[in-house]
Amino acid sequence: MPFKMSSKAQTIKIFNLRSDTNEFIGAGDAYIPPHTGLPANCTDIAPPDIPSSHIAVFDAETQTWNLKEDHRGETVYDTTTGNQMYISEPGPLPENVTSVSPGGGYKKWDSKAKAWVNDEGAEVAARLREAEGTKSRLLQMASGKIAPLQDAVDLGIATDDEKAQLDEWKKYRVLVNRVDTSNPDWPEQPV
């Protein structure tokens, strides 16, 4: 029964509400002076039994309680990206999440098995990207070694040792350029 104001002081049982969500946060007794209403953020209407992973939310307009799923504080994983998500708002879990961690590596969600499985395609693609990056760095490094040696040769001031180094570094650069990044076998760098 909703609260009725009275000309007499009264102590009644109230059910406290969180101010931002109107969720039930606890019960207590409240002293109500004559000709006053209930304190802010509370009701005298008892909430229903609240199952685990739920909260009771009071609707002030209809003066009724509603049960809402509550997964706040849980960590879940997006099944499309594997990214970790922290749940901070009440309500049902978002679509396409699981509480099972992908556990690192290259994984993808198998919706039939409801489990993370190895994603060989992603692993191969990552290895290929890594090899392409290595190839690019090695070619850049070789070109950096070749440039001053080539300058010495072009200017006619190269020593025999510099000419030999230039040939070795050019050969190395050609061999690096020929490396198949899907199955890399890197040549040895000149000394």
Swiss-Prot record:
InterPro entries: Phage_T4_Gp38_tail_assem, TFA_Chaperone. It comes from the Bacteria. Belongs to the tfa family. This is Tail fiber assembly protein homolog from lambdoid prophage Fels-1.
